[in-house]
Amino acid sequence: MQKLAVFLFAIAAVCIHCEAKYYSTRCDLVRELRKQGFPENQMGDWVCLVENESGRKTDKVGPVNKNGSKDYGLFQINDKYWCSNTRTPGKDCNVTCADLLLDDITKASTCAKKIFKRHNFRAWYGWRNHCDGKTLPDTSNC
């Protein structure tokens, strides 16, 4: 019985990442962001943000922040205000934090755009520290 429990735990641990995606190239990410309706004139900022926040991984969960919150997904969206850590969608983006970890980034994109509309890119420390006022990634060849 104990071996079965260990086996099932191992399968569950692997499957947590079954629906995750890693954008292996910058252009893969750019194509997906275009599909999600991100504006072309902001593409360099969004790519820089994603690369510095999550490393282009949809399943990234950040470490616990000083206030006890965590950041989730491709855009590292915070659970204090934006996503619910329960099975019921909630908070300002009306999503679960698990929704933000899927390879389908539709909900994460919608939430990121909502955050941007309220706070601009300054809502993300990865953007502030690595992108603001710096040379942005060139996405023109994608």
Curated annotation (Swiss-Prot):
Gene3D superfamilies membership: 1.10.530.10
C-type lysozyme domain boundaries: 21-142
Enzyme category, top tier: hydrolase
One Pfam match: Lys
Annotated signal peptide: 1-20
Reactions that this protein is recorded to catalyse: Hydrolysis of (1->4)-beta-linkages between N-acetylmuramic acid and N-acetyl-D-glucosamine residues in a peptidoglycan and between N-acetyl-D-glucosamine residues in chitodextrins
InterPro entries: Glyco_hydro_22 (IPR001916), Glyco_hydro_22_CS (IPR019799), Glyco_hydro_22_lys (IPR000974), Lysozyme-like_dom_sf (IPR023346)
Keyword Hydrolase part of the UniProt annotation: yes
EC code: 3.2.1.17
Cystine residue pairs: C27-C142, C48-C131, C83-C97, C93-C111
Key words of the record: Antimicrobial, Bacteriolytic enzyme, Disulfide bond, Glycosidase, Hydrolase, Signal
Listed SUPFAM superfamilies: Lysozyme-like (SSF53955)
Active site: E53, D71
GO-annotated molecular function: lysozyme activity
GO biological process, one term: defense response to bacterium
Cross-referenced PROSITE patterns: GLYCOSYL_HYDROL_F22_1, GLYCOSYL_HYDROL_F22_2
Superkingdom field: Eukaryota
PANTHER family (alphabetical): LYSOZYME C (PTHR11407:SF63)
Family: Belongs to the glycosyl hydrolase 22 family.
Role description: Lysozymes have primarily a bacteriolytic function; those in tissues and body fluids are associated with the monocyte-macrophage system and enhance the activity of immunoagents.
Name this protein carries in UniProt: Lysozyme
Organism: Hyphantria cunea (Fall webworm moth)
